[in-house]
Curated annotation (Swiss-Prot):
Organism: Shouchella clausii (strain KSM-K16)
A Pfam family recorded for this sequence: Mur_ligase_C
Its biological purpose: Cell wall formation. Catalyzes the addition of glutamate to the nucleotide precursor UDP-N-acetylmuramoyl-L-alanine (UMA).
Keywords: ATP-binding, Cell cycle, Cell division, Cell shape, Cell wall biogenesis/degradation, Cytoplasm, Ligase, Nucleotide-binding, Peptidoglycan synthesis
Pathway: Cell wall biogenesis; peptidoglycan biosynthesis
Protein name: UDP-N-acetylmuramoylalanine--D-glutamate ligase
Record field: catalytic activity: UDP-N-acetyl-alpha-D-muramoyl-L-alanine + D-glutamate + ATP = UDP-N-acetyl-alpha-D-muramoyl-L-alanyl-D-glutamate + ADP + phosphate + H(+)
Amino acid sequence: MKQVKELIGKRVLVLGMAKSGVASALLLARIGAEVVINDSKSRADQPQAGELEAAGIQVVCGGHPLTVLDGCSLLVKNPGIPYTNIVVKEAEARGIPIWTEIELAYLISEAEMVAITGSNGKTTTTTLVKEMLEHSGRKPLIAGNIGTVASEVAQKAKAEHVIVLEVSSFQLMGTNAFQPKVAVWLNIFDAHLDYHGTREDYIAAKARIAANMGPADYLVYNADDPTVVQAIARIGATLVPFSRINVVEDGAYVKDGTIFFKDEPILALADAVLPGAHNVENMLAATAAARLAGATVEQIRHVLSHFPGVKHRLQYVGSWEGRQFYNDSKATNILATKAALSGFAKPVVLIAGGLDRGNDFDELLASLKYVKAVVAYGETKSKLLALAAKANVQAVTAERVQDATEKAVALSQPGDVVLLSPACASWDQYRSFEERGDEFLDYVNTIIKPS
């Protein structure tokens, strides 16, 4: 890894002892900084406190005394900690720079970075780029908001690697020198306004992905999103558009039902596995980014024609007796289920339900065009029955996802899609959307692959 000489001997506060905080503290100690780490939870709730102290790091738990900032030249904070936190506000008042862990990862990395952000589609696009590069003989390492701590990956990365990094607005706010070789900005929707305060601040945080890029760097951006187009107007990178609607000859686009990158035909959309207009955008963005980072057309084509989707995110599970099964357990809101349904122009048996947050499901009415039946479960099942009645769609209820899937199979015929896309959070019955999706996968796999 590269040395960061300006941090040697400097006192640095790491705020938050989640995964990225612990990784940052250990990295800073390795660099040669004097490190103190602080978390509001008690020491009894911090199993890694001993490891940190063994590395020479001062551990302060059980509150946020402002004295932890005394003598500090830098604050590295967990991305989820808001800027309204008393320690963060005090650091700002004292003029102490505030970073997140991806800034550290960038500074030490010997490998080039491909960074992907956006309100939706980050994980799918990040995974696609990683697969395209891997199949092309590059050595990609996936990291960031996708679950692998970026600074841990960056310590292991060599010059021959490429770090493919999923980054959130929370992470990007704490960057200073961060400069990926290729950046992707997928889209912008109103989100996280409780954290950022205003839509303008949220957009500005996203735009930091390209703030330091120059003409030798590439920003792949959504030319169909007017907010993104406006936000990048002063960016110094070489701009590479992608568009699902128009032909953009200097980027990635769809022409006559085929994905192109510049003048290179990549793949007919009919041969891609991922359904939905939103996934066309993800595929276009990934194609452009991977091509710019050294992937071959042949291997991009191979990945797009075989990639089943990220687990629980409109994931293609398999087929049985002419029925196709998709796991979209990550669809924890109505907007996500609308996006999933937009991807199918064949009969769908929809499995939906979960935690009742007081939502009005009438927003889904227009999206039920191809839905032949609804299997509703969980706290919202009565609301979903009412929705189905308004749409003149057959509906039944179930207790849990496995029961719902059995009933969905019984209601389906060859040529149909059986889709788990709950439109609700899982917490009425499941600890997480992953646990809910795994129950669906377990049952479907017993059908597809009987023991």
